[in-house]
Regions:
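Cytoplasm-facing juxtamembrane segments at the starts of transmembrane helices
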Residues: 65-80, 130-147, 162-166, 183-202
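Membrane-proximal helix-loop-helix units in multi-pass membrane proteins
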Residues: 108-175
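C-terminal ends of transmembrane helices
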Residues: 54-66, 122-132, 179-187
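Short aromatic-rich membrane-water interface segments that cap or initiate transmembrane helices
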Residues: 33-37, 104-108, 112
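Alpha-helical transmembrane segments of polytopic membrane proteins
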Residues: 38-45, 77-78, 111-115, 165-171, ...
Length: 223
């Protein structure tokens, strides 16, 4: 003979309610509003500052390289082109893959890859310079980053983004010269690398200005 068990009925009701809540949570999709504020100006400014500092010193030979100067250069290299690019790369890749806040801006994947990789390689170069260790192995590193620079140039050229394509043209020239400069101890190459770093740094500052004015003031600068 069956009888009404209020305790058991209460347990069943709690279980049913819990199951409904779990199913509702599983079905619920979290979405974030699309944002036009792509943070690439942060990476551009960081890299541009690094190129002014490292490129200017290599091009003009001022100040002369000493252990003290190299430590200062290493600190700037770690934080500006290193950390600011790495931060931008992680920001972009997270926004593209987890939260989809940048829409279908597919070339931004290339930007996220480049900012992350360049940022980490600046960490290594900055620390190498800070402790004043041998720079010759950087020539092998430059081969990989020459490939990455050519890849970025190709992607943004096909996307029709000429200003960013020009940045990757500068990067391609820098790493193409870096290879023989480091591996073959080509003395003139150091100043050529500094020259193209300095010129690319100026273009990066323009791109920083153009992006910031467009987003902050609704300007129409070419970028």
């Amino acid at each position: 003979m069956s009888y009404y068990n209020p305790v058991r009925r209460l347990e069943e009701a709690v279980q049913e309610g819990s199951l409904r809540r779990i199913k509702k949570m599983e079905a619920q999709a979290f979405s974030f509003a699309s944002s036009p504020f792509v943070p690439i100006a942060i990476g551009f400014f960081g890299l541009g500052t690094g190129y002014f500092i490292w490129g200017g010193q290599a091009l003009f030979k001022f100040p002369e390289s000493t252990p003290e100067v190299n430590r200062t250069m290493g600190l700037w290299g770690f934080w500006m082109p290193g950390f600011m690019q790495f931060l931008t790369g992680i920001y972009l890749l997270t926004g593209l893959t987890w939260f989809n806040v940048f829409g279908k801006a597919a070339p931004l994947y290339m930007a996220g890859l480049a900012f992350t990789a360049y940022g980490i390689h600046w960490f290594a170069m900055a620390y190498r310079r800070y402790i004043d260790s041998d720079a010759q192995p950087d020539g092998w590193m430059a081969i990989a980053f020459l490939f990455l620079s050519i890849l970025g140039m190709d992607v943004f050229c096909h996307a029709g983004d000429i200003p960013v394509t020009l940045i990757f043209v500068g990067l391609t020239l820098i790493y193409a010269i870096e290879i023989p400069t480091r591996l073959l101890s080509w003395n003139l190459g150091g100043r050529l690398v500094g020259f193209f770093q300095f010129v690319t740094g100026m273009w990066l500052m323009y791109c920083t200005y153009a992006i910031t004015v467009d987003l902050a003031l609704g300007g129409k600068a070419w970028v």
